[in-house]
């Protein structure tokens, strides 16, 4: 068969007459007014695809459930490419072909453009109906296995020009944590507390009188706030406070639900059957998220939640040995309070220690917060009223802190409700040196002993030697080696925690830590931090880019990678608004990036026609990709063992737009990582493709031991040779080790296996030091943020030729062994969440730029004289047919030669249509009359080519 017929009908046409046609295009009602855009907010109510109407940042983490199944738009490209990779293999039956199914399985799993479809299935005619605003497409179910939507965000051409050729980069950049904005860590008096002035004195020499409170300038029962007169006197030790609980408005519903459970438990004579531990966990997790971080990255709380539920059942059991102590009748004890007492004890036992607001698990910190609403300072109340003290098995410091009251809690500035001029406590965080003046000859060794600073972070040499000896004896212990353990306790910013370090002593007087309002310099991290009071400058804003305080962290998305101590700030993807909107304004980050001095220079590196002043999100993402690429290569060039000996002084790591040019165009982080090894060790300028780069990193990550080394040697022979030889004599011989973490830390489709492990990095300082750098979801230590700033230090030309100390030689071998075995990147991902966001980003981009253009795309197989494909698309006319045809071709980056023809049908606002064909396909539009109905038909012809059978695509997809 060389001819195909596509009827094009109106809504009035009786579709029963067309039941035997394999494809039918049903036009929608003509538009009344001038047609400029579709109302995409109607999508959730139509049978199109599963994109819900909600906040855009929430939508990024949503698992699509309201759909009829998923389709992968590039599945044919992948399957055909795999078919082309076939190799002959001799079997008993003779010669057979074997496909690279391992590669095919990977590339399908690695795809980020899966579409969750919501279609209508017509059982009478065995057709699948794909809904659009401009038309409906009815496709025979035998032909519908590769049908997908082809959504396009229309480019703006007016005051600024967009470039939407590769819109998928935005999704990838966000998931690689390269599109984040930061707000510094912030603390306030706990919103679950009322801090009531109990007494006032005129000087610290005067004693507070027990039972005889005095009030000189402050009213009795005044509720103290940050920044008021009582607070000023509080800082001077002139007021005594009483702490009582209160319920913040944002968690009032959850606490009310807990109270219902509590009251049923009391009325039911404390029967454990009234305690639904799963429901309690759900409510407490909600409280923990709302009070600390509304948009916290989802954590796998399953195992901990089960443990917590077990502890809850245990504590509420009538046979629990502590129950009699808690239920002993005494003054100030109530059954209502006992419920929350048991909640906190269960949470503490689950945590094997005191629970704080900073606890990484929402359900545990939610238990503490809920109890604070009722009990005030929970652990003080437990000890003073319920004779319960922290257990000896808890951390030693938990015992020391038992008698104090802790009145500040960490809050997230993205979520904090607060008016301008409201006082908070925050951390100022600055790089000590944004750039260094260096030369190749002198290098850039870390100065661990800076002059004229208030507090300096120092290594504890005894603990450091113990760590090195343990590595020599037992190898690299990724779970127990920690950076904070090898630093002196005094001036250790990895141990600072204002929630624990600001307290009320036994006399209810405030105690601040010695580091408060002082700069702590941590030279190994090129960082200095200071906690101090600050005023809010802005109200809460849906745009995360709006800085809330007068002294915020000043860093763009790429510069943030240099802020190593990431527990001193919070992160959010820099997007605002909703998932579905006809028109909305983007985050202010795009305009801010355009103002960067290097914006136009970096964009000129790309071999495409761009508006170098456009704030289009795709163009700003191109800028971030280029900046990331240059920053990584600029830093890592100094860790390659070969270096020109020069006294020329330059700023490092300054971004040079002319540096590290490549043959090819950058679209993915993985290309930069792979190119780093190619560039320095293999002397290649060619940038590998996205699929090849991701495949290389995947193979390295899934292999272990000797197999991993063989994979590295296959793709990077010179680098692999250094790993295999392990000839550690001079400093230059171990410099390749700092490249190893990059194999495992980055990716938009990976998740870490752990919450907090450590990896080895060499620091070049007064001597070579091996440091345990922590990586994981805890404290936002994602991607290269955990290592990058330490890599700014590199050895001088002469240092490279120095003989290695014996301990470094022995540890280097252990480091190689660790990186050959580590499974850091094997945490697994929620594929249904990660892979289904392409349509979401396209819809969101359309609301920021020029609107949404729709289309439905499917394929027909050709069997003779060659096996190939013809693509057919029905779309609106908001985007030109030439643009759509180009986009269709881009769906076949691996097997473009097999796409021999394209049919593009554009539906206009008045419901006329135009047809464009290219390749082997020709067309003709005719009129058809059937009884009293009349319609158009599109006759498609492929002279000399024969359409294939129904199951040819099925066979191809099962090679």
From Swiss-Prot:
It is found in: Virion. GO terms for biological process: clathrin-dependent endocytosis of virus by host cell; virion attachment to host cell. One of its GO terms (cellular component) is viral inner capsid. Keywords: Capsid protein, Clathrin-mediated endocytosis of virus by host, Host-virus interaction, Inner capsid protein, Viral attachment to host cell, Viral penetration into host cytoplasm, Virion, Virus endocytosis by host, Virus entry into host cell. Its main location: virion. Transmembrane segments: none annotated. GO terms for molecular function: structural molecule activity. Disulfide bonds: none annotated. The VP2 protein is one of the two proteins (with VP5) which constitute the virus particle outer capsid. It is the major target of the host immunogenic response. Responsible for viral attachment to target host cell, probably by binding to sialic acid. This attachment induces virion internalization predominantly through clathrin-dependent endocytosis. Belongs to the orbivirus VP2 family. This is Outer capsid protein VP2. It comes from Bluetongue virus 3 (isolate South Africa vaccine).
